[in-house]
Structure formats: C-alpha cells, structure tokens
Amino acid sequence: MYFCWGADSRELQRRRTAGSPGAELLQAASGERHSLLLLTNHRVLSCGDNSRGQLGRRGAQRGELPEPIQALETLIVDLVSCGKEHSLAVCHKGRVFAWGAGSEGQLGIGEFKEISFTPKKIMTLNDIKIIQVSCGHYHSLALSKDSQVFSWGKNSHGQLGLGKEFPSQASPQRVRSLEGIPLAQVAAGGAHSFALSLCGTSFGWGSNSAGQLALSGRNVPVQSNKPLSVGALKNLGVVYISCGDAHTAVLTQDGKVFTFGDNRSGQLGYSPTPEKRGPQLVERIDGLVSQIDCGSYHTLAYVHTTGQVVSFGHGPSDTSKPTHPEALTENFDISCLISAEDFVDVQVKHIFAGTYANFVTTHQDTSSTRAPGKTLPEISRISQSMAEKWIAVKRRSTEHEMAKSEIRMIFSSPACLTASFLKKRGTGETTSIDVDLEMARDTFKKLTKKEWISSMITTCLEDDLLRALPCHSPHQEALSVFLLLPECPVMHDSKNWKNLVVPFAKAVCEMSKQSLQVLKKCWAFLQESSLNPLIQMLKAAIISQLLHQTKTEQDHCNVKALLGMMKELHKVNKANCRLPENTFNINELSNLLNFYIDRGRQLFRDNHLIPAETPSPVIFSDFPFIFNSLSKIKLLQADSHIKMQMSEKKAYMLMHETILQKKDEFPPSPRFILRVRRSRLVKDALRQLSQAEATDFCKVLVVEFINEICPESGGVSSEFFHCMFEEMTKPEYGMFMYPEMGSCMWFPAKPKPEKKRYFLFGMLCGLSLFNLNVANLPFPLALYKKLLDQKPSLEDLKELSPRLGKSLQEVLDDAADDIGDALCIRFSIHWDQNDVDLIPNGISIPVDQTNKRDYVSKYIDYIFNVSVKAVYEEFQRGFYRVCEKEILRHFYPEELMTAIIGNTDYDWKQFEQNSKYEQGYQKSHPTIQLFWKAFHKLTLDEKKKFLFFLTGRDRLHARGIQKMEIVFRCPETFSERDHPTSITCHNILSLPKYSTMERMEEALQVAINNNRGFVSPMLTQS
C-alpha cells in the first residue's frame, strides 16, 4: 500500500498497486509530467505524459493509470529515476537503461536523440556495475559499485563536473575529480549535482545561481565546473542529500534538516529572505527527521518521532492545467503537516517527492521503534564477515569464484579499499586520519596468510589499483589509500619491490603540490607502528635496486622515485620528531654505493659540466638523510680525493702548457708541500699556511720534515697534524682555556695570541679533515654544533665544565622562592678570570623563579657565543676556507666530531684478528705468537704509543672507514739484533724473527719509545 497526493486534492489518496497482486510499491520517481513506480517484484510501472517517450512505450500521448513497461519485463529492476522528461532504470546486474527525451544527451546512449520510446541499454556502462542513478532536469548521474561517478547530458552550467570547456555529453563520462573518494550517494538537481562521501563530506557542482551549492567565501561563483568540497556542510554530519530545481536539502546524523538555495516558493522551510544564504536549519520541524526528499519546488521530510510527514513549498506557478492522476491540482501551496493519524495501522516506510506528485510507502509493522531511513546501495568494501568468508572458502567452489570477484573489485579500487577501513563517523570535527590503520593491518595480515588471496591482491594492486591512485586529488578521503597500502604485507614482500613499491613511490612523486601537502599532513599524524614500516618498505626497495645494479635510465628513475618519497617523509618526520633520524639511514649504502662516482656526478652537475639534455642519473648525495655516519665520511673522503685529482690534473695541464709555450715562469706545484723543522714546527707550518693560496688546500698534502728521511705517505702527515695539535692545544701555549682540570678546552674570553692565529688554527683543522686525518682536538660537542649553525645547550656546558653545568642545573631544579638570595646568585658571572654582567647592571639583579631560565640561557650564550665571538669567527673562517660547508651541513654534530677527531674505542682482540701475515709469517708462527702475547701485556698508553709507531696516529678513524690491523713482514736481511720498523701509510710492521719473549718485549719498548721522526728507515741495536 502507498499514499500519494499532489495537485487537486489536499487529501491523501490511499492506493494499492494495480496488475501485480502481492507486490507493493518499492520506489517512486516523478519527472515534471510523468511518474515511475518500482514494485517489490521488480516490475516498473509508468504513468503521465508520454509526449517525449518518458513512459517507456509507444502509443498514447498520456497514460492515465500506471502500466508496466513491457521492455523491462524480463529484467530484475532495482532502481528508477526521473529527469524532467527522461527516465532511467538499473537492473540487478548494474546495467542502466534509458528512455524519453534525449536532445541534450541525457539518455547516455551515445547520440542526441530527440525521443526514445523504448528503454535502451547504455552500452558505455555495460561492463560497469552501477548501484545508484539520479536524474537532473537534463542530465544524469550514476555511481558504480567501485565508487566511480559518471555523468552525461546537458552541461550548460557545469552540472556534469567534467571541468571547463566540456559541451553536453551523449555518453557517460567519468567525473575524475571524485576518483578515489569512497562515496555513499549521488544526487542531481535541476542544473546542479551533489555527491556525498562515506565520511560525510559533501561535494557540489553545477549551477549555483541561487546558492544551491552552499559555497561560501568571497567571490562565490554562479557555477562550478568541477566538484567542490562544501565547507559549510563539513561538520554537520550529513547522511543524505536531495536536490530540487534550484534548492538543496540535507539530513544530518542527529535528525536535523538544513536547506539552501532558491526559496521563492518557500521550499527551504523558512520565511523567504534574500539575505539568508548557505545552509539553514529548518527550525519549524518539531521532532527528529529520518527521511527527506526534494521536489522541484518543495521539500518533504518524515519526522519519525511524531509520525508526521512535513511538506513545505509548492508547485510551479506557471502550470495551466492538470497533468496526470497522481498530481491533480495546480499552483497549490502545500506547506502543511500530514498527521500521523492519516497512517492508521501502518507505518511510513519511504517518502518520494516529484515536481507535482508525492508518494509515501508504508508497511504493517507498527511496533518497530527503529527510525526508517532510506537505504542506498553501497559500494564494495571489506567487512570482517566477508574476510572470514574469503578465508574459509573451498577452492573451485561457487563461493570461491564469488570471493575472487569481490577481492578483484575491492583491491582494484582505491575508493573501495579506503571504504573498507573508514573510522566510525562522528558529528564533530573530522579526525586527523580517516582510516583505521590498525584494523587494516590486522585484516591484511589475516588475508595474506592464504596464498591464493595474497597472490590475487598482488595482481590487483599491480594491474589496477596502483594505476588508479588519485595522485591529483586534493581530498584527504581520496588520499587515504596511500596510508593503507603500506599496511599490506604484499607491499613488503621482497619479490614485489619493483612491481608494487616503485609504482607506489612514483605515484607519490607525481602528486600535485596540493595533494602532496594533504598527504604529508596525514603522515604527520601516523603512529610509529605505521610510519616506520613505510620507511623500511622504501629502504628495502632501494637496496633491492642497488643489488640488481642501477644501469638503465629506468633503474635511475626507480631509485629517484623511491628517494623522492623518502625525502618527503623525512621532511614530515623532521618537523614532528616521530622517529629517530637514523631510521632513514640506509646502512647498506656504505658498502653498495660507489661514493666517488656519486660525488663526481654531483660536482659535474653543480658545475654545469653535464649537458642539459642528458638523462640525469640518480645522485644519492642529494638525499643525505639516507647516509649514516660511515657513508657521510666516505662521501667526504670521495670529495677530497676528487678535488685533489682535479687540482693535480689542472696543475699538470698548466705545466704541459708552460713547456709547450716555453714560458719563463715556473708552473705551480701539483702538490701542497709543507717543509718544516721539527724544532720550529708550529712557526714554520703557520708561516707557510698564511702564505698559501686557496687553491693549494685542494691539492695533495705533502709534509717534509727537514733533515729527516720522509717517504710520501699518509703517516708523515698524520704525525705532522698530531704534533701540531699537541703543541698548540697545550695550556702553556695560551691559545685555549681549560675551565677545569682534565676538561675540554674552549676559546678564551680575552685571547693572548693575535686573532690571525685562530684563523690559521681553523685552517689547520680543516686541512686535517680534508686530508682524511684524525687528531686529538679536545673541544666539546658545542664547537661542532656551532660549525653547523646549531645552538649549544646546557648539556654542552656540562661537557665543557661539569661543575658549572651541574650548578646551573641545580638552579633550574630548585623550587625555592628565594633561590637568588639563598645561593647569592645575580645576573653577573665570573668566567675565564673575568667578572661579567649578563645584562646591564646584572650585579644588582637577583635570580628568582621568574627569571632563572633566562639567567641560565644568557650564561650559556655568553660562554659559547658572546665571549668568544671574535676569535671563534676567525677559527670558523679558517676552517671553511679549506672545507666546503655544503657537504659538511649533512653531518650531525656528533658525526662531524667523529670525522675530525676519530675515536678511541679500541678493540685490541679485533686488532689481532684483522691482522695479515706476509713473507713467511703466519698466525701460528712462533714469533707472531710471542708478539701478541707481549702486546696484550702492554698498558693502554703503551698500546696507543705502539699504534702511533705503526700508523702515525694514536686514534682510529670512524668505525668502518679503515681496518685496525697490522700487516706483518719479515725481510730476509733482518736479524734478531734488529728492531722493528713500520711503513705508516700501509700499517706494515717489519718484524725480525725474535725467538724469546725477553727480546720481543725489549723490541716493543724500543718501538714505543721511538715512535716519532723519520731519521732512519731502520732502528738498529748498537
């Protein structure tokens, strides 16, 4: 049973469906002058005007009573919709049939046909399962099972949502702006359209001449050619949208109705005023609403708490005569309440509004307390029961085929996958992330335990979903799929890095700027449990590509995409500090990457030595966050070697040019040679450094100790730097101050040496680093922070002066109100034998709870910055005259410190294991056995002195840079009377074949006590 009313009668007309015993009215739809009735047996009846073929049959111009549409009799029809003069029907297989007026393309049959009397299948949609359709006056919308929206028909106001310059369309077109968004509904009005997402976001497009899109802000357009997210509806909790000719009504989760648009007929439910624009609550409705529906110029609402059907607005005023039996009067203001008393013994099921006609379906069950709402067909998504069914199905069964079909659809559609894990909607502010990643992770884990499901998911992602990712969508709901995919185990399978992870990363890199910003905001809210696996997935793919070699242009493009995505993630993490920085380090790079080639490419590119049209290879150095400390030092070494080689090549070219042109002047040396006397070491070295040109520092450094036999080896320069720093950092030398006994050193507040000496000392430090040397420079970490433009902290002061740092910490921790009086603290300090006010008249300003943090901050700033400004700036200027700041900025302070001073984490057992044996020696040789036994008896200081004898330094490079080892040799000319000798640049120890422990211990002491100088190639016992 159903009720209808409209034109000539204020009374409800109670009707039963004719010609279909036992069938009830399931759905009704009305155009301007015709109606469709869909029955529960899936037959479609039509009545009204047929001048444009809108009844779906030939013959009479009008159908006074509802009659079946014969062309649809063989179909199981699930949905119907009416435009002004055209009709649509959807069968249970999702096929769409159209008939009626088609001059604007609104039938979607591929031609602008004036009239189509019989329903025709829309062939463009033949392979797509449509679950919803909605007709505007002259256009149509369809929603597919996989959440695609199609539009066709008239586009004079942009109501198709296809963008600018699109004419009317005779075939369905995808509304690409909505791709990836899990949708709940589509609704068409006169010349405007809406879509509602499962998250509750409303998207409107088309005509906005009367404000029917609810767009806000300055310069509101009169039409929109693309779907726009309607901000005014965002936080209302919209669950249903209905559109009239030029007005719109929305129903919220809490049973309220908001309307907007044209109000000339009172269709918005409040007094017509031109000032009221945007969504307005219909306050006159007394109770909670569960259904709404818009006619062209009026609105219906079912108030389930009172059992009333509320109607406001009226039919168009230009109608001159009755239309059909379902709407018998003209120009009638139907703003009234239809009482629950009219529905005796029945309960309202659904309401439907047309231009003139209104329908109410009922059911007999009056005991139900559940609010009857309109249940719309939904897009595909995974439910827990569905997942369990998939896991349980037997292979080759009917259920198995159905499961495969469901999996194929969901895992091929970004929107369906997102819909599967949406968080429960609320009526308040939207959550930071729309999807439940923990639920997704658990579901994917269960599903992929089944090999056939895992294989299907992989295929669907590779063939369809990754190609359909909404890279240019500005909507968070569409981009949520980028959060879900990394939760799936198949994305982490080592076999899938190239076919899944690389395309995924490329999609991120191809995003529009706006889309990427939205995605990055989502990344910023990720928990460690989601963010870390995402990073590990990318790292694993990069390693896999490197293991497969990076030769082709495509290989380089793959790595660029992976690194590009990691770069964006790194930016997000840096701003939010979710994960430690070293999470992004790819430790394997230190062994897999050729740093010389990589740095060379970067230098060539930066110096414009590569033609612009040449395909550029990936340069890992452009992504320094992937480098661990070892990789950064190797990159620094590569940079030094390349620059030395370039400098040497340039010098030889100049020499060649000089010879050819017979020039008188002697060309510059290809080496940077320092000739120094050991007795005047510092003076000689600083004099020559001050005379050097900037280009000299890029050359290979050669140090010659005058009157000594100095092989061109790293060992000589290592000893040079060791001796220079040892001398210049002594307290008695006067360049640096030591706040406490055994503490680190720092720049003095009132230096005794001239400022230039600090400049030269900075050059010396830079030269040591550039030449890959490590030296003992007892500076605190604060120095390396300052070199990298970072601010020293209280922790740095604790390192420089433990006692002072501890006392300042106590000041911060002290909760007493009279802290300044109790401790006699003022804004005046004593530092480096000077009394200093931290602020003007600081001696008279006590420290209290309100200013103690400022006091500590100014104390730290004075020590590390204010007091040393002049001398530190000279030091920094000298340091960066040699070293390139661009490459050092990639280091963290701790890493730069390690690169400069090395480490003293000695592993003497490993030292023994790493060692090699040549010229008749082997590990089991008696002399070797004696050596290690004697060596391990030495004190730590003696072992360090022996290390200096062997290598020219008593410190180690950063772990992994250089093996700590000895290469044992026994020249035939050696006798037991000879002492051991070393070749420092190669860690070679020439060890005579001693036969007793006493002789071995004696020889080691000689080496330890004569570990400096190059007077003779061999120390021989007299």
Curated annotation (Swiss-Prot):
It catalyses: S-ubiquitinyl-[E2 ubiquitin-conjugating enzyme]-L-cysteine + [acceptor protein]-L-lysine = [E2 ubiquitin-conjugating enzyme]-L-cysteine + N(6)-ubiquitinyl-[acceptor protein]-L-lysine. The lineage of its organism: Eukaryota, Metazoa, Chordata, Craniata, Vertebrata. Pathway: Protein modification; protein ubiquitination. The keyword Oxidoreductase does not apply. GO terms for cellular component: cytoplasm; cytosol; nucleoplasm. PANTHER family: E3 UBIQUITIN-PROTEIN LIGASE HERC6-RELATED, UBIQUITIN-PROTEIN LIGASE E3A-RELATED. Its EC number is 2.3.2.26. The gene is HERC6. It is found in: Cytoplasm, Cytosol. RCC1 repeats lie at residues 41-92, 93-145, 147-198, 200-253, 254-304. It is an enzyme of class 2 (transferase). The active site is at 985 (glycyl thioester intermediate). GO terms for molecular function: ubiquitin protein ligase activity. Detected in brain, heart, placenta and testis. GO terms for biological process: hematopoietic progenitor cell differentiation; protein ubiquitination; response to bacterium; ubiquitin-dependent protein catabolic process. E3 ubiquitin-protein ligase which accepts ubiquitin from an E2 ubiquitin-conjugating enzyme in the form of a thioester and then directly transfers the ubiquitin to targeted substrates. Pfam families: HECT (PF00632), WD40_RLD (PF25390). Keywords: Cytoplasm, Repeat, Transferase, Ubl conjugation pathway. Gene3D superfamilies: Hect, E3 ligase catalytic domain, Hect, E3 ligase catalytic domains, Regulator of chromosome condensation 1/beta-lactamase-inhibitor protein II. Residues 693-1017 form the HECT domain. SUPFAM superfamilies: Hect, E3 ligase catalytic domain (SSF56204), RCC1/BLIP-II (SSF50985). This is Probable E3 ubiquitin-protein ligase HERC6.
